[in-house]
């Protein structure tokens, strides 16, 4: 089936037809113990094995009829046919990497321009070391004081998690303002792809843009149905951003009539809403919550006559909230069945962060064996991928994928 729009995502579970990934690269080898916390990693993955695991992920997707595209290929295609756009991109990338001095900027421009577009993108993501710019010399105070720091531009290891920088909603998407400085550059790629790539330019409405002054991340955005969108108010996404997205969707008269803002704990274990729950079938969700935990949610609706957004606050159990707004009885499968020890461990390794490739079919990390067994007992078809290295980045299959096209349900 051919879709008239290049973006078509009206659910979390419609059969996945096209998805965006990033294959791990040298950026993981430029992580060091002294900078990994600042770059939001708890450990350093072994690149050779991480690539094998990620290729297994991509092969599983392809084996189920999903077209896999890579962000590095899309941005390379975007920049290959117009030198002026390429030059503009290089200048913006260098500026947003925090480079301010004229001689360092010139050296970096020369470095990036003297390689193919594909190599340039790979090296931008990998980061630029002092050894990469062997001909660059500076006797400025700043350079001398920081001479022992090996990187001129930090690597971008979090681009592995393509879900966060931008998120498909309906026929459009949000290009997000990331919460942490280290992830700001990731959204430059989205800006240029959706502005200049021949498939996407002039064809994709933008519901939220990276130049907004409040933060929003894709892991907090869940398309529950054609009518209902859930957004987490978390340590990474601010409440003002939810209102901005809601207003844009309501005013553009997209199908969504209710935006549910879920207030979740601001901690690394609950980094995004999709670490708390994900949808795996029409009425079934995975989650990491206690039986008595109640969520505070804010239901945003639109008053057409006044042009105002109405907000109603509620506090209830997750299954009651989802059941009411989806109009059905909801089943919640807890990580490791809610076991205090195994549940916490499997949540840490993204046991609740599943990727639905069709209703009742999910890709999961094999290491979360107790949760995976429960899924199978509920009749869910489970595709397990290896994850000893990928899991070190604290993101699961949903985090590592950005759906571009899903079948409508």
UniProtKB/Swiss-Prot annotation:
Residues annotated as transmembrane: none
Record keywords: Arginine metabolism, Cytoplasm, Hydrolase
Enzyme class: hydrolase
Protein name in UniProt: Arginine deiminase
Protein's organism: Borrelia duttonii (strain Ly)
Localization, UniProt: Cytoplasm
NCBIfam families noted in UniProt: arcA, PRK01388.1
InterPro entries assigned to the protein according to its UniProt record, in alphabetical order: Arg_deiminase (IPR003876)
